[in-house]
């Protein structure tokens, strides 16, 4: 027999626990208070670190953000997805590592530091390389923590104890190792090729660092005369007309091309043109590249200053003539290369008027001379895409220069096979096609940049220009048997940032460190998934696959892939579908959505440090209109839930703050539901009510059976959707269950039973158990997306069920499905009850009866099965539908004047008598009737007017006829309703 003292003590302890729980859940949900200090507690407790004691592993490498950058919405979206996956797998029992790190971001970081120095009156070129690098490291130490602080604010559960930086010693060693081995394998070479050249910053750029900006320009049409004055076109002219948006490049033309199928010019193929200005004689060549329909069908070819012309020039073995220096000024002597194998060019003297001119000054002069000399045909306005440097905004020039390249054909084959045979899966699958198309046409990769900040290329030159490649100078001398007195100079260039990023999955796991814990690579490589945007499939994803498969091998010597799945998400755009950019003034900072920001601060943020200050006034006006009160604080969980709810694989998302507001309300709903559950666990005096600690299905009724069935069905769906990377569906599952099923239905049904004196104490104890059990389970399955809110509430709920096996929900077990609880019959019964309740609520709304009025309800045409079902749920039905009396009509019973609704074949009726004031309702309907009657008569008169009908467009007349028919239908229904009211 139980000791009464022990029972009383247990009750007192429970009361204390519940009161403490309520005190931790204040009346109003305040995300800033909930979040404060929580992340630091998680991090300090080591919850984000792997344990190496699990059978299954899950790992993600964080795409490294710019070390000195700030979080943008793309980062926020990406991090929300990765953290949801990481937290899910950690809770689901996997040995989990989310590997963090930052990128040195060569050109971006160097530009920031140069601007800071220029503000102090210091130019980089006036400093030594070593002194400048020291300044960059100072800047990195000063501002490098900003991005990681912001990642923490997002709740991202990365293992900070393993944080890496692409310029760390370990990663730098990996970069050197890879470069040297590729060079020794004959896969890295130095050669002259056409590159994107930034003349302002004087470095080669990757395609990703070039923005094609829509701009208004001109299309100049020039007459290029035949060398042989006896040759003419079909229409008798002794010249061809070519069009260009870059007249200055005419100085470097080496051919004119036509399409071989173009009959207008077939007789001219193989003839020659004498170029204006230079007097150079160039051939007319035939190539399918030329569009017959564009312009005259004749194209000037400048292989050294246009990527398409470069390829055409290679096909026709045309010489390349470089006319520009590194500053985009016209060379005093143009460099002529018969082919790319020729190291030293011959020189062709530039016409004196052009030597040394800046490119646009040369353009102006050339157009003026063309007009004066009679070879300017015409000038047209032209919409073009200007290639501008992403940072700095300079027009980028295709320029012929010596650079370092990776010969990627050999590396590409295993990377193609790995995707073709399914070792690596793209989600969604269509991105496999994008990857394969690029890989099958892959070009050698330019990996050198003319910068000071970055991984300096491990190559040295002697005084004769011979190249030596090794990990350091000492190894160079040893490897190549060079005497100590041989002078060596290290290459000044640094590697493309994407080179070090291409090693990211394995270099961060200490691949190049012989003293590292081998379990890290063995356990977490290949990584499980790469989460990325489609815009860097070529620049990063493909290169990671190639590099990893070349350098990382399994025990049997087969290549190891970097990741098993590539999850590709869309880009975050504004609410109108526009790309977010500083220049458009539509950028949102995730931290401002979390913490809120005043209007003036937001305006200042959007209009300061703009590349085009003239846009500031327009952006300020736009911002004040869009955010008149600034941005309120929504909290991290609402933002994360918004991101995941929009994460439909592969699609761009249009970000709308109204969505965040809606999910902030969802967080509030969970908070309030939790408080309600706790308050229903104590009596009016605040003493604990009985709460069962285990399930007792024998006393469950339909609501308990239903919510437990729905809970387990939801768990099944969530697991399935996580496995499919459908985080939008995971969010939908969570929202639908918690808001629509738990809060709107089960909590309301439970409330009715707990307030019903006829319900036994035994059942009430089970209802409280189910309320708590379902809530605690829902908190756990929601945690990967809403970590802060769920942790705060779980800490108060779990102890009441003795479920604090762990100190934090972060490492609690993820819910698993109990199939024995799922019942299709139970869910069908509940669906019927919901329809029944909804039908009464609809009638209540149509009759404009307040919720306080309890209604008499009649049921007609009820089947035997429905009658049995009704007997089990009558109390719940009456409580939630606010029904005063429930009567089942027999066949032949008189049916009073009622408002009705159908549930299948069952008719639900609410008698009108006594519920409304017939006189007042008739008066109201009469006014409405008169108004509608006037409208219908006006339209009828219009349609009776022959002038209107004959002159108005047919669609206008038809619209008026449809409107009249609709009004007449409303009048007929209103007349019948008024007749019914007269009979009450």
From Swiss-Prot:
Gene Ontology biological-process entries: valyl-tRNA aminoacylation
GO CC terms in record: cytosol
Enzyme class: ligase
InterPro entries (alphabetical): aa-tRNA-synth_I_CS, aa-tRNA-synth_Ia, Anticodon_Ia_Val, M/V/L/I-tRNA-synth_anticd-bd, Rossmann-like_a/b/a_fold, tRNA-bd_arm, tRNAsynth_Ia_anticodon-bd, Val-tRNA_synth_C_sf
Top-level taxon: Bacteria
Coiled-coil zones: 954-984
NCBIfam families given in the database record: PRK05729.1, valS
UniProt remark on domains: ValRS has two distinct active sites: one for aminoacylation and one for editing. The misactivated threonine is translocated from the active site to the editing site. The C-terminal coiled-coil domain is crucial for aminoacylation activity.
Entry protein name: Valine--tRNA ligase
């Amino acid at each position: 027999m139980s000791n009464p003292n022990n029972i009383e003590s247990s009750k007192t302890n429970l009361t204390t626990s519940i009161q403490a729980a309520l005190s931790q859940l204040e009346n109003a949900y305040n995300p800033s208070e909930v979040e404060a200090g929580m992340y630091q507690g998680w991090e300090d407790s080591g919850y984000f670190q792997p344990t190496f004691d699990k059978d299954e592993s899950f790992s993600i490498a964080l795409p490294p953000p710019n070390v000195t950058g700030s979080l943008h919405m793309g980062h926020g979206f990406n991090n929300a997805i990765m953290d949801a996956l990481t937290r899910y797998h950690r809770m689901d029992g996997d040995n989990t590592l989310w590997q963090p790190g930052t990128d040195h971001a060569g050109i971006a970081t160097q530009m920031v530091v140069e601007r800071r120095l220029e503000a102090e009156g210091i130019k980089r070129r006036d400093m030594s390389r070593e002194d400048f690098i020291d300044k960059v490291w100072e800047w990195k130490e000063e501002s490098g923590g900003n991005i990681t602080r912001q990642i923490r604010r997002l709740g991202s559960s990365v293992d900070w104890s393993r944080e890496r930086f692409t310029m760390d010693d370990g990663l730098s060693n990996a970069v050197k190792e890879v470069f040297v081995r590729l060079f020794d394998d004959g896969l890295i070479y130095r050669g002259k090729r056409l590159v994107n050249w930034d003349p302002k910053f004087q470095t080669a750029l990757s395609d990703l660092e070039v923005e094609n900006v829509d701009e208004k320009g001109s299309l100049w049409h020039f007459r290029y005369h035949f060398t042989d004055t006896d040759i003419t076109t079909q229409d008798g002219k002794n010249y061809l007309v070519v069009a260009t948006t870059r007249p200055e490049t005419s100085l470097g033309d080496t051919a004119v091309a036509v399409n071989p199928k173009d009959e207008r010019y077939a007789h001219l193929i193989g003839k020659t043109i004498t170029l204006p200005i230079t007097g150079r004689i160039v051939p007319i060549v035939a190539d399918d590249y030329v569009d017959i329909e564009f312009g005259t069908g004749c194209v000037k070819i400048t292989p050294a200053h246009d990527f398409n012309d470069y390829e055409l020039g290679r096909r026709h073995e045309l010489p390349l003539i470089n006319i520009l220096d590194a500053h985009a000024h016209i060379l005093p002597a143009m460099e002529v290369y018969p082919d790319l194998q020729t190291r030293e060019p011959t020189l062709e003297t530039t016409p004196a008027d052009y030597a040394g001119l800046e490119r646009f000054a040369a353009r102006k002069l050339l157009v003026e001379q063309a007009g004066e000399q009679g070879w300017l045909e015409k000038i047209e306005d032209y919409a073009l895409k200007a290639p501008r440097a992403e940072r700095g905004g300079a027009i980028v020039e295709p320029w012929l220069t010596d650079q370092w390249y990776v010969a990627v054909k050999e590396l590409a084959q295993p990377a193609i096979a790995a995707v073709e045979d399914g070792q690596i899966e793209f989600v969604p699958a269509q991105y496999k096609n994008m990857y394969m198309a690029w890989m099958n046409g892959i070009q050698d990769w330019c990996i050198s940049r003319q910068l000071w900040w970055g991984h300096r290329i491990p190559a040295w030159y002697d005084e004769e220009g011979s190249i030596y490649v090794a990990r350091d100078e000492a190894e160079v001398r040893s490897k190549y048997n060079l005497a100590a007195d041989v002078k060596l100079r290290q290459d000044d260039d640094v590697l493309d940032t994407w080179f070090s990023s291409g090693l990211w999955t394995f270099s961060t796991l200490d691949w190049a460190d012989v003293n590292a814990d081998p379990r890290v690579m063995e356990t977490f490589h290949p990584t499980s998934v790469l989460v990325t945007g489609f815009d860097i499939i070529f620049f990063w994803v493909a290169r990671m696959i190639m590099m990893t498969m070349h350098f990382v091998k399994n025990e049997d010597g087969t290549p190891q892939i970097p990741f098993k799945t590539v999850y590709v998400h869309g880009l975050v755009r504004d609410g109108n579908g526009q790309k977010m950019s500083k220049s458009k003034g539509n950028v949102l900072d995730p931290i401002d959505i979390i913490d809120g920001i005043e209007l003036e601060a937001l305006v200042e943020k959007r209009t300061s440090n703009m590349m085009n200050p003239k846009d500031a006034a327009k952006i300020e006006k736009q911002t004040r209109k869009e955010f008149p009160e600034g941005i309120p604080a929504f909290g991290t969980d609402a933002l994360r839930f918004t991101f995941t709810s929009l994460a439909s694989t592969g699609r761009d998302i249009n970000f709308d703050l109204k969505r965040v507001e809606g999910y902030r309300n969802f967080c509030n709903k969970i908070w309030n539901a939790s408080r309600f559950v706790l308050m229903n666990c104590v009596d009016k005096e605040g003493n604990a009510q009985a709460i069962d600690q285990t399930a007792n299905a024998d006393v469950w009724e339909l609501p308990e059976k239903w919510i437990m069935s729905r809970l387990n069905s939801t768990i099944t769906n969530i697991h399935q959707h996580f496995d499919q990377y459908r985080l939008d569906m995971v969010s939908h599952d969570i929202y639908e269950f918690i808001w629509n099923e738990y809060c709107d239905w089960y909590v309301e049904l439970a409330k009715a039973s707990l307030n019903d004196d006829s319900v036994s104490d035994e059942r009430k104890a089970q209802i409280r158990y189910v309320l708590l059990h379902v809530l605690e389970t829902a908190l756990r399955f929601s945690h990967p997306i809403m970590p802060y809110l769920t942790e705060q509430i779980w800490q108060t709920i779990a102890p009441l069920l003795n479920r604090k096996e762990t100190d934090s929900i972060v490492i609690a077990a993820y819910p698993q499905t109990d199939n024995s609880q799922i019942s299709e019959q139970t869910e069908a019964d509940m669906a019927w009850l919901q329809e029944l309740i909804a039908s009464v609520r609809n009638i209540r709304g149509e009759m404009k009866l307040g919720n306080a009025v309890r209604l008499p309800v009649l049921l007609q045409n009820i089947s035997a099965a429905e009658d049995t079902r009704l007997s089990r749920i009558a109390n719940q039905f009456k409580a939630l539908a606010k029904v005063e009396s429930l009567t089942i009509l027999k066949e032949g019973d008189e049916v009073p004047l009622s408002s009705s609704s159908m549930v299948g074949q069952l008719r639900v009726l609410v008698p009108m008598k006594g519920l409304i004031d017939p006189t007042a309702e008739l008066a109201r309907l009469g006014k409405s009737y008169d108004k509608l009657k006037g409208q219908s008569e006006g339209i009828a008169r219009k349609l009776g007017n022959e002038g209107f009908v004959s002159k108005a467009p047919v669609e206008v007349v038809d619209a008026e006829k449809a409107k009249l028919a609709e009004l007449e239908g409303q009048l007929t229904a209103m007349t019948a309703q008024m007749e019914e009211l007269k009979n009450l």
